[in-house]
């Protein structure tokens, strides 16, 4: 029994480490770096009132129907309409075990469990979900299921929310640190 636990633990650790060693090739998900505000990650209050959550990504603006490409290569974990705020959405598991989310899409051009390459079209820009009254955009965010514990004690964004939200920083990475700047 101890041997099984030891082998299983080593295997899980090896898989996690391999995921972190895979190089991350990057592409701009949509449009150009000039089409998003670099200071909107963790902006608060993002929703009406002061009880809303901080903004967990950046909104990249463009025209309805503009191509949205995968920022990195990976496995599509979700590709369908998500009722409520997100609308049509795609989630891609990429290197370093990061989940890249693309929300408010017009069309979805990939399917669950597809492998995508960096720069491969996965959707088109839209206004779905709670973005119907805003200019067309893709909300792009990066989630890490393996928490970065040290981030819970820091701050992010240009308008720091109440500390009750800081634990979420362990799981949400600032997309502007991973997008091209030019």
Language-model-detected regions and their locations in the chain:
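Zn2+-dependent peptidoglycan hydrolase active-site motif and core
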Residues: 70-109, 135-139
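Surface-exposed, glycine-biased beta-strand/turn segments
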Residues: 2, 14-88, 118, 127, ...
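A generic structural motif
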Residues: 61, 93-95, 143
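Acidic, glycine-rich catalytic/binding loops that coordinate metals and/or anionic ligands
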Residues: 30-35, 112-120, 136, 141-182
């Amino acid at each position: 029994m101890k041997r099984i636990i030891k082998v299983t633990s080593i295997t899980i650790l090896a898989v996690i480490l391999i995921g972190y060693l895979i190089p991350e090739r990057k592409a701009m998900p949509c449009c150009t770096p000039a089409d998003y505000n670099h200071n909107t990650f963790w902006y608060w209050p993002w929703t009406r009132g002061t009880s809303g959550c901080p903004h967990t990504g950046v909104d990249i603006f463009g025209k309805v129907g503009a191509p949205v490409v995968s920022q990195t290569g990976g496995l599509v974990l979700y590709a369908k309409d998500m009722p409520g705020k997100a609308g049509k959405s795609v989630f891609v598991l990429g290197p370093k075990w990061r989940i890249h989310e693309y929300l408010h899409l017009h069309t979805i051009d990939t399917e669950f469990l597809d492998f995508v390459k960096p720069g491969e079209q996965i959707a088109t820009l839209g206004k779905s979900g709670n973005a119907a009254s805003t200019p067309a955009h893709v909300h792009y965010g990066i989630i890490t299921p393996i928490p970065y514990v040290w981030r819970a004690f820091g701050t992010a964004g240009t308008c720091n929310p109440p500390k009750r939200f800081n634990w979420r920083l362990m799981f949400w990475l600032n997309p502007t640190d991973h997008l091209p700047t030019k």
